[in-house]
Regions:
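Canonical Radical SAM [4Fe-4S] cluster-binding loop centered on the CxxxCxxC motif
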Residues: 2-41
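Active-site proximal loops enriched in glycine and acidic residues that flank catalytic Cys/His/Asp
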Residues: 10-12, 22-25, 32, 49, ...
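Conserved, mostly hydrophobic/aromatic
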Residues: 14, 18, 45, 62, ...
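Flexible glycine/acidic-rich beta-alpha junction loops that bind and position SAM and/or redox cofactors
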Residues: 16, 28-29, 72, 129-131, ...
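Short acidic (Asp/Glu) and glycine-rich catalytic loops that position anionic groups and cofactors
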Residues: 25-29, 54-59, 152-158, 174, ...
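Conserved SAM/AdoMet-binding glycine-rich loop
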Residues: 42-154, 184
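Catalytic cores of alpha/beta
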Residues: 165-181
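Radical SAM enzyme core and accessory elements
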Residues: 226-276
Length: 276
């Protein structure tokens, strides 16, 4: 955790249209006129990792799901990394569920360890589907233990508060579901579940930013200057650039704080009351 995290990028642009994302397919087309994503070749991506490895013994985050282009892209990349003898710890990103075959391939490639970043954003399938993430809770629940069984050393899972069609109860349930997810893995498995506000700003260029009323949002900032002024506020709640039909800024803040003891209690049980 004390080492710097370096990054390599699989792609410029994206094939996915997550409503809240300023790097979505919609945002890239609308803001930078990119009609389709431009993928770095698997061989060049592996070369990027080799260059970092030659200078630093530090974790390397591969930005973008390796399978976004195709399964063949991921296989070519992993083979190239094996041929180059990648030794650094590697962090992969998931945009949907994954299975044993993929994780086994990752595990035999990165012998010195690998971990996962996965952002479902909500446990609520309705909320997630509206955002543009159509995979099921079952896919998430199967992915996590499978990853650990195949050698994953750490799994970071991210939920947010303040999403379209997400009311207070739905937001709280994302914390409650942590108990089920932690119960699905062994005590020694490092599953970290984060639950935080969609903050501080709605991504400029995202579908929500460009059409806020369509998504049930009221924005408090549109221009750069308006966003700068929000940063002068005394608390993070007042920095938020939005409210939704389902949750006010007060709701987002209250829910965020109410989840803390719930998540603390569950994580303490998961870790056998060891210090977090």
């Amino acid at each position: 955790d004390k080492l710097p995290l370096t990054s390599v990028f699989t792609v410029r642009g994206c094939t996915i249209n997550c409503a809240e994302c300023g790097g979505s397919h919609f945002a890239n087309g609308n803001v930078v006129c990119r009609k389709k994503p431009a993928f770095r070749s698997p061989e060049k991506l592996a070369e990027d990792i080799s260059v970092i490895q030659s200078y630093l013994d530090t974790p390397i985050f591969i930005v973008g799901d390796l399978r976004q282009h195709s399964a063949g892209y991921a296989q070519r990349f992993l083979k190239e990394c094996r041929d180059r003898g990648v030794k650094n710890h590697v962090v992969i990103e998931l945009f949907n569920g994954a299975g044993m075959e993929y994780f086994n391939d990752v595990d035999r490639t990165f012998e010195n360890g690998w971990s996962i970043e996965f952002s479902p954003d909500s446990h609520d399938e309705k909320v997630r589907s509206v955002l543009g993430k159509g995979y099921t809770n079952q896919a998430i629940e199967q992915t996590i233990p499978t990853a650990f069984e195949c050698g994953c050393s750490r799994f970071d899972l991210f939920y947010m508060n303040g999403l379209p069609y997400q009311d207070r109860e739905s937001a709280m349930d994302s914390a409650r579901v942590a108990k089920k997810l932690w119960a699905s893995v062994k005590q020694e498995d490092k599953l970290f579940i984060y639950n935080a506000p969609f903050a501080p700003f709605v991504d400029p260029g995202s579908r929500i930013f460009e059409n806020p009323s369509e998504w049930g949002y009221t924005l408090r900032a549109r221009t750069l200057e308006e966003h700068r002024r929000l940063l002068d506020n005394p608390s993070w709640k007042h920095v938020l650039s939005y409210e939704t039909k389902w949750m006010s800024r007060d709701d987002v803040a209250e829910i965020s704080y109410n989840k803390i003891p719930m998540l603390d209690a569950e994580s303490a049980m998961k870790l056998g009351n060891r210090k977090l």
